Regions:
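Acidic, Ser/Thr/Pro/Gly-enriched interdomain connector segments
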Residues: 2-15, 22-70
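Intrinsically disordered, low-complexity Ser/Thr-rich linker and spacer segments
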Residues: 33-40, 97-119, 134, 234-239
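Short acidic, glycine/serine/threonine-rich helix-capping segments at coil-helix boundaries
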Residues: 41-52, 56-101, 208-210
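Surface-exposed, glycine-biased beta-strand/turn segments
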Residues: 105-166, 197, 206, 210, ...
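Zn2+-dependent peptidoglycan hydrolase active-site motif and core
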Residues: 134, 150-188, 213-218
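Surface-exposed strand-loop junctions at beta-sheet edges and helix termini
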Residues: 141, 150, 184, 189-190, ...
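Conserved, short, structured surface segments that act as functional micro-motifs
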Residues: 169-173, 193-239
Length: 239
């Protein structure tokens, strides 16, 4: 039964690819809606709009610091250090000229093509959500809808996970790319398993911190969350 449903899902993905691209995919290389305007170094203890903009810019680059409140506390200093480490900069937790200049550049994109895990409208996109930052996209689909691997890779997590994820599958791909599939009702893979792109990994559910059935989908590059829609513009069903 699962095999037949997966075959049908792949056909639908191939037939609907251009419609989805026109309706919900972000344009390639889309830049975040905010940039760091400050030229003055920002450090622990700072407050105000420049700090809030720094928090947003770091989140867009995949290094969220918790609540976006315009206050430079320990969490923000930690996010700055993680960004500096990933960028090969001196790690000091201070957003100086070089750090700020790199944050003005467009966020990184996935270095491999990714396919849609399922075809569905986007509920919550990647980006600010009130005073928090949503690190993935929510794809709205009926409970039980098949969820497919976005690319070939090895399963690194398959099971319940605390923190609101519910039933979660994570897959490690090439070039430091990792994909995450949360709130699943059923998981069909196990840790260590090698998957082809488009393989069935589970089914849509509402486990964990979810108010209704949907797939929370994340893409991370060397640990930094990126906008999944920018990574999915190729739209092949698990290339």
């Amino acid at each position: 039964m699962d095999r037949a449903l997966v075959h049908t899902s792949r056909l639908v993905l191939r037939l609907s690819v251009f419609v989805v691209a026109l309706c919900i995919a972000a344009p390639a290389g889309a830049a975040p809606s905010t940039s760091v305007a400050s030229r003055t170094p920002l450090r622990a203890g700072a407050h105000g709009s420049a700090v809030r903009t720094l928090q947003l810019a770091l989140a867009w680059h995949g290094f969220p610091s918790g609540t976006i409140d315009g206050s430079f506390g320990p969490q923000l200093a930690g996010a700055v250090r993680r960004f500096q480490r990933a960028a090969g900069l001196r790690v000091d937790g201070v957003a100086g000229p070089t750090t700020l200049a790199l944050l003005r550049k467009a966020p990184r994109r996935a270095a491999i093509p990714l396919g849609w895990p399922l075809l569905a409208p986007v509920g919550d996109p990647f980006g600010p959500r009130g005073d928090r930052f949503h690190g993935g996209v929510d794809l709205l689909a009926a409970a039980g809808t098949p969820v497919l691997a976005a690319a070939p890779g090895r399963v690194t997590w398959a099971g319940p996970r605390a923190g609101g994820w519910g039933n979660l599958v994570t897959i490690a791909h090439q070039n430091g790319v990792r994909t995450l599939y949360a709130h699943l009702s059923i998981i069909r893979v196990h840790v260590g398993e090698w998957l082809a792109g488009g393989a069935l990994i589970g089914r849509v559910g509402s486990t964990g911190d979810a108010t209704g059935p949907h797939l929370h989908f994340e893409v991370r590059v060397h640990g930094a969350a990126i906008d999944p829609l920018s990574a999915l513009v190729t739209l092949g069903p698990g290339t």
